[in-house]
């Protein structure tokens, strides 16, 4: 029977540890770690994600500072808000909720975030440092996936990992993190030819493509580790990027959808904010 990589249970365990660390930091410095979240516009899903992150802050004893900006906000106005947060010594982490309205240069705004406060791992500088094996906060979803693999004693070194997806916040950093852990990595995307054949070679498969059940169950080889980073609402529940029905008969381990990667994304963001606060406050 396949091992279920339960992200929800692991996230709860990590949050319990973070609560202790936050209390220790408060006792030592009299200061509370603060995550600033910036929401631009009125996208309902984005507002939900920001609320979930605020709830996670409260669970570990942190504070969150919510910045809400109107839909018509310009790049210059958003950059000015980010600069204020960079300069605010009470703020230890900055999250710019993706996506932003089309008129905003999202990349310029991500890269304006101070490296020390880039707890969501979105800056080019942070990505470059991570890719070179230097200290930086990793993009939250792939960093959460690496924690799931590590905590479940999944062997990565020497394994063939296939990452399906090449986005700047998921596919690319995921591939770099697996490479740093000594996997042999193949990156696939929408233009990849012979995708089923490449997936069949994977010891570890990561679905990060953003298309519901694109990766078919019969593409996956016996004994593979299956990580599904996608979520697509369906019939009151949801599915991922990988066809998971019956996957326990094929995989040696897999992340369920929901309850696998998702909870660890938010917990990783919170953990990296606590780490940033510990560094800033000594």
Swiss-Prot record:
InterPro entries: Aminoacid_DH-like_N_sf (IPR046346), NAD(P)-bd_dom_sf (IPR036291), THF_DH/CycHdrlase (IPR000672), THF_DH/CycHdrlase_cat_dom (IPR020630), THF_DH/CycHdrlase_CS (IPR020867), THF_DH/CycHdrlase_NAD-bd_dom (IPR020631). Keywords: Amino-acid biosynthesis, Histidine biosynthesis, Hydrolase, Methionine biosynthesis, Multifunctional enzyme, NADP, One-carbon metabolism, Oxidoreductase, Purine biosynthesis. The keyword Ribosomal protein does not apply. GO terms for biological process: L-histidine biosynthetic process; methionine biosynthetic process; purine nucleotide biosynthetic process; tetrahydrofolate interconversion. NADP(+) binds at residues 165-167, 190. PROSITE patterns: THF_DHG_CYH_2 (PS00767). Its EC number is 1.5.1.5, 3.5.4.9. SUPFAM superfamilies: Aminoacid dehydrogenase-like, N-terminal domain, NAD(P)-binding Rossmann-fold domains. It catalyses: (6R)-5,10-methylene-5,6,7,8-tetrahydrofolate + NADP(+) = (6R)-5,10-methenyltetrahydrofolate + NADPH; (6R)-5,10-methenyltetrahydrofolate + H2O = (6R)-10-formyltetrahydrofolate + H(+). Pfam families: THF_DHG_CYH, THF_DHG_CYH_C. Pathway: One-carbon metabolism; tetrahydrofolate interconversion. Catalyzes the oxidation of 5,10-methylenetetrahydrofolate to 5,10-methenyltetrahydrofolate and then the hydrolysis of 5,10-methenyltetrahydrofolate to 10-formyltetrahydrofolate. Belongs to the tetrahydrofolate dehydrogenase/cyclohydrolase family. This is Bifunctional protein FolD. It comes from Acinetobacter baumannii (strain ATCC 17978 / DSM 105126 / CIP 53.77 / LMG 1025 / NCDC KC755 / 5377). The gene is folD.
């Amino acid at each position: 029977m396949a091992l279920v990589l339960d992200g929800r249970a692991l996230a709860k365990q990590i949050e319990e540890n973070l609560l202790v660390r936050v209390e220790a930091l408060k006792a030592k410095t009299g200061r509370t770690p603060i995550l600033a979240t910036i929401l631009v516009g009125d996208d309902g899903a984005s507002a939900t994600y920001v609320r979930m992150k605020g709830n996670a802050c409260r669970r570990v004893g942190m504070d969150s500072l919510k910045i809400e900006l109107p839909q018509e906000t310009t790049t210059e106005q958003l950059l000015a808000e980010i600069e204020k947060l960079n300069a605010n010594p009470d703020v230890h982490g900055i999250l710019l909720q993706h996506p932003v309205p089309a008129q905003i240069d999202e990349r310029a705004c991500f890269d304006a975030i101070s490296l020390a406060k880039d707890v969501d791992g979105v800056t080019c500088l942070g990505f470059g440092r991570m890719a070179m094996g230097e200290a930086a906060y990793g993009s939250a979803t792939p960093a959460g996936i690496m924690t799931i693999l590590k905590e479940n004693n999944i062997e990565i070194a020497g394994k063939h990992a296939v990452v399906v997806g090449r986005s700047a916040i998921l596919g690319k950093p995921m591939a770099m993190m697996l490479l740093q852990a000594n996997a042999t990595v193949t990156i696939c995307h929408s233009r990849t030819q012979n995708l089923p054949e490449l997936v069949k070679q994977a010891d570890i498969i990561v679905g990060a493509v953003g298309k519901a059940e694109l990766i078919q169950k019969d593409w996956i080889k016996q004994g593979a580790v299956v990580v599904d980073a996608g979520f697509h609402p369906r019939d009151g529940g949801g599915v991922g990027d990988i066809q998971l029905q019956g996957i326990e008969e094929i995989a040696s381990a897999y992340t369920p959808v929901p309850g696998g990667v998702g909870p660890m994304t938010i917990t990783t963001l919170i953990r990296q904010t606590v780490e940033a606060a510990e560094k800033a406050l000594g």
